[in-house]
Structures are given as structure tokens and as C-alpha cells.
């Protein structure tokens, strides 16, 4: 039997508004199957006008599938959807728009060479010539009403990530949406941009809009939402008022058991230089600088966080170190662990010769004995092969080392099964193609494989993106284990709260330059956020201008 509970508010929003909130959407017994997999199992859920509802759940719990049925991407196998008290049939996004429902996806769907106004009206039907000036005026009116800051005539390729997200939200508002669904809306925003977005969402709530947010960030749930609905393994667990709960209770509802929400930052026994980057400069295929004179050191026995607005050079930095991107200038020196570095009180000599990695391919880097692991941002494009099963994906880094015409699959099969057990990967078996796994489970496969290669340098980009709370904390634990083994961990992250708790130091990139390197124990989220939007001279912590 499903556990369902709804707690009454303590001085809730209905009382503050002086009226009883009206139901915007009601889901009754919604079920969706994909083959033998039941993604949603008889879900009942209500979304009210004039509220912000957060939707929580572990990976594979059915959150996105459920919202995709409301927005017309999927059609339910069983159950009913009621909008404004009337049962409706939603077979396409066009049907959803006609009912005032719009979904803003995490990955933007914009045309770079078009302006904001052109993207907003793109796809709308009309008779005769389209009045783009009138559309721009309407966009400006909506922006001023809710507090958006956007230039309707600005090209998308000149926009920041937050401006692009603004255009996506304006697209659904322009089409008359009263019910908005946002999937991980703060994933790539700075703290300051997040606060601006929250202010806009609160304005829309005050205007009577119904807003659903899919997120894994519990502190944002507590700060923004009125109620929280929780799914677990495709089933509806319950809805609680935010004022009556806390992150620990929400986590227990999601996972089904108590989970510690403390992120450890243990002190390693020793710390020695592992990477030294000097004046690293890279350009993209169009000749634009993606990295500009980047210099820093990374040490074994530490986690070095790398923060920055999306597109600030994080991806290019890791790829240049891994030999996947050519460098125009600069060097990357690798220093192997010193044989005596784990002896208490031993100081590793500073005059060691490093191995130059610039100019080497990933295969050449492996052949000179550099044990470097890389978890890329693009999981299925660069990290794994979607059509292969887990066993074959385990072999991608080592199959060239086998001699003879046949490849031994016993060891990679055992590794795949061990990762399933240790990381709680949800899959029918090791022979299932990874493209059939949820995004979070794909990430576990990739991170698990790289960590198992016993690296001395582990570079990972957004390792918990799309992961639920339980899985995220598992990954944090794995990164700390590597740190305590003397591995130099380079972690590109987007959640500053996590970086501040987990990392020993944080390197901040802005426009391809190092704008600051700060101590994770002595800085604040606001300070890091300012470095993300401002080049501050590349000062070390304690040496700021």
C-alpha cells in the first residue's frame, strides 16, 4: 500500500492570501509503462494556482516522466488529467499550450542567431506578415510585469546562461501559460542569478500562476516552495507543506530510510604536488580563446573545486589536461607520487622534474605511466558508448592492453556487477545497453569505472548532475576516498554549497581566466559568486586585492 500524507499548513499561504487556493491540475491514478518498466504507478497529485510546488524523488522515481505527460510529450497508459476541474486529453505540447501549460527544460532549445523576441515567437501560427515589433513590445511588457531583465533585440549567442533561461520562460508566458514546469532551473546559475530567478518566480506566484519545480537542491526547495511532493520508485509517497518539514524528513521520504546530509571534508595524511599548470591557453575551432593564461597547482590529497558560469572554460581545462584538446601555449606538468610522500613528516622535494602532458594524446599519456582518470560532462558522447552494455563499457580504457585475438570479459563483467551492487545502479543486468538507464545511473557507471582504474589524478565534471540526494552523497564519499588515498581530485561543480563543504580549495574561472583561488573553509558562496562574474586578478586566498 502506498504511503500518502498531506500535512496541514501552519499559517499557510491560503490564510495569507485570504482565499482558498484553487486546483490548477489534478492527476488521478496516472500510470505509465515502458515495456516491463513501470515509470509511474497510479499517481495522484494536485497542483494549485498561486503556489510553487517542488517535485522531489530519486533517479528513476518518475518525476520527469510524470511532468512530460502533463506537458504533452508522453501519454498516460492509465488515469485521468484534470485542468481547472475539467478532465482533458493531452496528446502533444500543442495541446498543453492550449490548456495554458508550458515546460521549461534544463537544456535550452534556442536558435543562436535569432534575437530573444524571434526565439519567443518562433513556431507561432499567424496570418500574413508577422509584426515582430509588436511581439517585442509584448515581450517587454511581460518582462516588466514579472521582473525579467532581457533585451528583446539581443542575439542568443551574446546572452549569458541566465538570459537564455529567461527567454525560455518568456516563450511559455508569451503563449499564455498559467501552469509552468521547470526542470532543474538553477543547475547552471550563479547564486546571484538564482536569487533573481526566485524573485521572478515569486512574482508569478503572486499573479496566480501554478509553478512546478523539479530539483535535487533541498536548500532551494526550503527557500522557495510552498509544498513539496515526493515520488519513490514510480509511486506517490505524499505531499507536505514546506513550513512543516525539513531537509532530513524530505530525504527520508525520498529514500525510505534515514540518510546523513553531512558532507565530510577529511584531512589527508599527506599532500604533494601532482599537477602544475602554467600559462595554459586554448582556442576553439573558430579561433576564440576558451582558456587564457591559466595557471594553478593541484596536489595529491586534496579536492580542488573548479567553479564558474557555464562556458567559462571548465570543460576546456579538463580536456586540455587529459590530452583531448590542443593547447596554443603553456604547459601541464605531471608529478608522480613520491615513494616517501606517505611517511609522516616527510617533505616531498620541490625540485622534481615533471612530465609534460601538453602535446600528448590520451594514449600517449597512459603509455608514459600517467594514471589519469577523466569523467567528462558529456556522459554518452565522450564517456560511454550508449549502444554497448556495462561490460563492454568497462573495457573501453583497457581493451588495447589485451594480447591475442580474444578479449577476456570475466574481469569487466565482475567489475560491472560490483559497481551495480556498491553504487546501487538500477538496471535489469550487466547486459543492458547503457542508453536504457536513467541519466543518474549512467553517471554512476561512468564514475565507478574511472575510480576503479586507481588513478593518481581524477578529473570529474559535474559528477552528481542529475543524481538524487542518496546517489550524490555516495559520489561525495567516493571522491573523499580517492583524496585520502593521495589522489589529486579536480572537481568541476555547479552547486556552490557542495563545493564549499567538500573542496579544500576552489579555483574560479571567468571568461577563460582564473579570477580567484580561495580556501573552501574560509570563503562564502557570495564571494565565489562575485569571482564567477568578475575577473579579480587571479589572486590566491589571503592575497586578494
Task: Please state what every model-predicted region is.
Residues 19-545:
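Glycine-rich phosphate-binding loops of nucleotide-dependent enzymes
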Amino acid at each position: 500500500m502506498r504511503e500518502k500524507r498531506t500535512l496541514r499548513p501552519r499559517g499557510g499561504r491560503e490564510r495569507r492570501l485570504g482565499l482558498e487556493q484553487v486546483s490548477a491540475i489534478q492527476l488521478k491514478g496516472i500510470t505509465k509503462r515502458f515495456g516491463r518498466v513501470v515509470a509511474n504507478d497510479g499517481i495522484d497529485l494536485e497542483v494549485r494556482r498561486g503556489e510553487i510546488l517542488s517535485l522531489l524523488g530519486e533517479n528513476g522515481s518518475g518525476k520527469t516522466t510524470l511532468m512530460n505527460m502533463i506537458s504533452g510529450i508522453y501519454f498516460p497508459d492509465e488515469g485521468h488529467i484534470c485542468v481547472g476541474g475539467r478532465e482533458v486529453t493531452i496528446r502533444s505540447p500543442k495541446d498543453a499550450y492550449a490548456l495554458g501549460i508550458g515546460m521549461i527544460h534544463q537544456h535550452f532549445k534556442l536558435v543562436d542567431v535569432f534575437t530573444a523576441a524571434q526565439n519567443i515567437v518562433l513556431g507561432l501560427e499567424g496570418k500574413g506578415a508577422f509584426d515582430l515589433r509588436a511581439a517585442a513590445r509584448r515581450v517587454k511588457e511581460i518582462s516588466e510585469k514579472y521582473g525579467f531583465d532581457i533585451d528583446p533585440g539581443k542575439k542568443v549567442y551574446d546572452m549569458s546562461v541566465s538570459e537564455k533561461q529567461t527567454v525560455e520562460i518568456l516563450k511559455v508566458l508569451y503563449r499564455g501559460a498559467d501552469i509552468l514546469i521547470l526542470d532543474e532551473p538553477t543547475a547552471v546559475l550563479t547564486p546571484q542569478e538564482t536569487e533573481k530567478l526566485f524573485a521572478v518566480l515569486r512574482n508569478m506566484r503572486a499573479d496566480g500562476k501554478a509553478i512546478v519545480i523539479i530539483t535535487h537542491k533541498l536548500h532551494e526547495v526550503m527557500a522557495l516552495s510552498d509544498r513539496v511532493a515526493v515520488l519513490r520508485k514510480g509511486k506517490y509517497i505524499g505531499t507536505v507543506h514546506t513550513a512543516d518539514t525539513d531537509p532530513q524528513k524530505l530525504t527520508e521520504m525520498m529514500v525510505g530510510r534515514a540518510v546523513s546530509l553531512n558532507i565530510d571534508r577529511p584531512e589527508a595524511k599527506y599532500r604533494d604536488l601532482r599537477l602544475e599548470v602554467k600559462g595554459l591557453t586554448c582556442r576553439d575551432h573558430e579561433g576564440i580563446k576558451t582558456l587564457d593564461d591559466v595557471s594553478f597547482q593541484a596536489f595529491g590529497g586534496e579536492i580542488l573545486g573548479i567553479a564558474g558560469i557555464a562556458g567559462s572554460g571548465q570543460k576546456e581545462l579538463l580536456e586540455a589536461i587529459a590530452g583531448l584538446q590542443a593547447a596554443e601555449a603553456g604547459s601541464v606538468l605531471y608529478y608522480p607520487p613520491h615513494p616517501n610522500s606517505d611517511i609522516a613528516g616527510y617533505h616531498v622535494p620541490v625540485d622534481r622534474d615533471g612530465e609534460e602532458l601538453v602535446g600528448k594524446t590520451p594514449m600517449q599519456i597512459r603509455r608514459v605511466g600517467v594514471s589519469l582518470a577523466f569523467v567528462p560532462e558529456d556522459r554518452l558522447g565522450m564517456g560511454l558508448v550508449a549502444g554497448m552494455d556495462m561490460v563492454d563499457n568497462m573495457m573501453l580504457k583497457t581493451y588495447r592492453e589485451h594480447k591475442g585475438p580474444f578479449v577476456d570479459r570475466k574481469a569487466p563483467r565482475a567489475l560491472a556487477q560490483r559497481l551495480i551492487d556498491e553504487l546501487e545502479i538500477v538496471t535489469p543486468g550487466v547486459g543492458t545497453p547503457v542508453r536504457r538507464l536513467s541519466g543518474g545511473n549512467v553517471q554512476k557507471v561512468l564514475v565507478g569505472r574511472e575510480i576503479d582504474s586507481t588513478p593518481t589524478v581524477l578529473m570529474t565534471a559535474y559528477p552528481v548532475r542529475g543524481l538524487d540526494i542518496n546517489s550524490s552523497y555516495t559520489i561525495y564519499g567516493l571522491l573523499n576516498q580517492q583524496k585520502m588515498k593521495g589522489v589529486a581530485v579536480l572537481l568541476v561543480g555547479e552547486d556552490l554549497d557542495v563545493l564549499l563543504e567538500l573542496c579544500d580549495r576552489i579555483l574560479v574561472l571567468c571568461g577563460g581566466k582564473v579570477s580567484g583561488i580561495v580556501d573552501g573553509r574560509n570563503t562564502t558562496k557570495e564571494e565565489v559568486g562575485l569571482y564567477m562574474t568578475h575577473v579579480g586578478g587571479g589572486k590566491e586566498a589571503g592575497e586578494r586585492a
